[in-house]
């Protein structure tokens, strides 16, 4: 592969999306971008705080990482930034390795992601079974919810452990510091987020709920109708954040806020900082690097596929998307950011708000910059319990809880992989869950494929025994040739073996080795090994090894 020819294929979707771009499309993208930017701001702060970082780490990750992913990515509408899936991983890395090493592992993961896209390996991410993805997603959702109980309850806990069981112990030990004001704010936020969309649930023909529509007709209030429509488009997290922050400020409620814990949010871009790279450090961080890269790749490409389904726009380019994710994660750590990836909630909001191109993603970043510059001083009043309520809502929406109810209808393999990955994620960590889950998936796949290989004896005389082979003869199925070897060992001298292989679709090195051993056993007893109906792939394998010349074929 020559680098110049490959660079010719480096085509961000932004380049093709703006071809024939119109003013009408710009206004749609701008409106969608503003909406997504408003939604993204509280989420970015909440994800950073939940990860054990300062809120500005999430904000600048959303701005810088989001801009790079939109500008260079392979999806027209995907929105990038900090994601809930990374909360548990980042918190564990910071606790175990420290903040500086988080930045290094994120940058290294960016390099790995870029290389995956560069060598066109984006399709490999689809080989991760959906049962594993569902299991670790639900596990992460549980861990996010558990990690937010401290702030939801207003407990005075100096530092929360990343260990599942230790978190329960810490919460129990500090239960006496419960702050009822914080709990009330958090529960109000959570309840409001569930109720808000129900107030404006649209009716297909009218766009308003039947009850609201009747009320509008009764009072014939055009202005009220417009106000309701505008309210229905306002994101629930923003309504909860603004309302409850104002309530806390004016009533002077004694709860912990961003200001009391972090001292406020800087209004300037963080300075460029070069982490202390060394090969020894990089080697130490191999596991977190691979975890960040794998989760980022899976999360972003799943998100891009969802965007394709709901937007009706041309399909995303997975390799271009991975390269964009790589660039974003290589750059963001130098500004003190956290891992960035595609985010489903913000991407769906973008599509439903009318976004049609990466311009919407860039506008979402511009919106966040404007809001930060204008309103950063006000963020000091945001109660942490309200952010905890928002994250609990995110965790609820993140999980696929209905899958537990349908497990009895699923296959044993699906149940084993999903539940195994789920419990390993919760009890241990995502790295262990992914490693064990993928190994278990491979073992189950080999077992399933081995059952598809069949050996059937069709005839036997003192001179010749005939067998028909079906399926794929690979390392997981070679034991099924043992009955043929048993026949050879107990047969009279000079018996030949005929293998009808017209239904044998593939042959690997292990299968070839067993056939060679079988051939030697037959020849030692004065017989012949005959193949009838060899297909192209098995014939090619046998020919390259020289085995084909040693046997008879029909």
Put a short name on every predicted segment.
Residues 1-453, 514, 546:
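Transmembrane helical cores of multi-pass ion-transport proteins
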Residues 458-554:
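Structured cytosolic domains appended to multi-pass membrane proteins
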């Amino acid at each position: 592969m020559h680098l110049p020819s490959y660079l010719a294929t480096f085509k961000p979707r932004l380049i093709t999306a703006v071809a024939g771009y119109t003013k009408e499309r710009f206004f749609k993208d701008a409106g969608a971008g503003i909406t997504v930017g408003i939604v993204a701001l509280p989420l970015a702060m909440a994800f950073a705080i939940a990860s054990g970082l300062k809120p500005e780490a999430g904000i600048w990750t959303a701005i810088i990482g989001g801009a790079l992913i939109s500008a260079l990515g392979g999806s027209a509408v995907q929105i990038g930034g900090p994601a809930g899936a990374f909360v548990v991983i980042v918190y564990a890395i910071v606790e175990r390795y420290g903040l500086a090493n988080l930045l290094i592992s994120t940058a290294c993961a960016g390099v790995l992601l870029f290389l995956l896209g560069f060598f066109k390996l984006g399709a490999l991410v689809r080989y991760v079974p959906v049962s594993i993805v569902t299991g670790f997603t639900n596990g992460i959702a549980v861990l996010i919810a558990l990690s937010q109980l401290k702030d939801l309850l207003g407990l005075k806990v100096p530092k929360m452990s990343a260990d599942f069981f230790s978190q329960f112990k810490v919460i129990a030990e500090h239960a006496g510091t419960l702050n009822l004001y914080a709990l009330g704010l958090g529960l109000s936020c959570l309840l409001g987020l569930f109720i808000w969309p129900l107030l404006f649930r649209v009716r297909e023909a009218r766009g308003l709920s039947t009850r609201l529509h009747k009320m509008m007709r009764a009072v014939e209030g055009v202005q009220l109708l417009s106000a309701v429509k505008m309210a229905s488009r306002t994101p629930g997290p923003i309504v909860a954040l603004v309302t409850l922050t104002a309530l806390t400020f004016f009533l002077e409620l004694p709860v912990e806020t961003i200001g009391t814990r972090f001292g406020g949010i800087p209004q300037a871009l963080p300075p460029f900082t070069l982490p202390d790279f060394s090969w020894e450090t990089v080697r130490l961080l191999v596991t977190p690097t691979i975890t960040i890269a794998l989760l980022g790749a899976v999360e972003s490409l799943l998100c891009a596929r969802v965007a394709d389904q709901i937007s009706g726009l041309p399909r995303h380019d997975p390799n271009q998307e991975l390269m964009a994710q790589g660039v974003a994660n290589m750059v963001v750590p130098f500004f003190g950011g956290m891992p960035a990836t595609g985010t489903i909630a913000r991407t769906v909001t973008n599509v439903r708000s009318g976004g049609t191109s990466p311009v919407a993603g860039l506008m979402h970043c511009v919106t966040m910059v404007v809001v930060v510059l204008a309103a950063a001083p006000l963020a000091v009043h945001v109660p942490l319990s309200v952010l905890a309520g928002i994250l609990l809502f995110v965790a609820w929406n993140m999980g696929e809880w209905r899958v537990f109810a349908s497990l009895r209808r699923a296959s044993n393999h699906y149940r084993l992989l999903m539940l195994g990955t789920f419990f390993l994620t919760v009890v241990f960590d995502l790295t262990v869950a992914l490693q064990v889950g993928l190994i278990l998936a491979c073992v189950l796949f080999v077992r399933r494929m081995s059952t598809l290989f069949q050996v059937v004896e069709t005839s036997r005389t003192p001179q010749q025994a005939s067998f028909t082979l079906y399926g794929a003869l690979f390392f997981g199925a070679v034991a099924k040739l043992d009955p043929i070897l048993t026949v050879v060992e107990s047969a009279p001298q000079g018996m030949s073996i005929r293998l009808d292989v017209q239904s044998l679709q593939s042959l690997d090195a292990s299968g070839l080795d067993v056939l060679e051993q079988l051939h030697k056993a037959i020849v030692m007893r004065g017989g012949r090994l005959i193949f009838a109906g060899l297909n192209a792939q098995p014939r090619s394998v046998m020919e390259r090894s020289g085995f084909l010349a040693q046997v008879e074929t029909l």
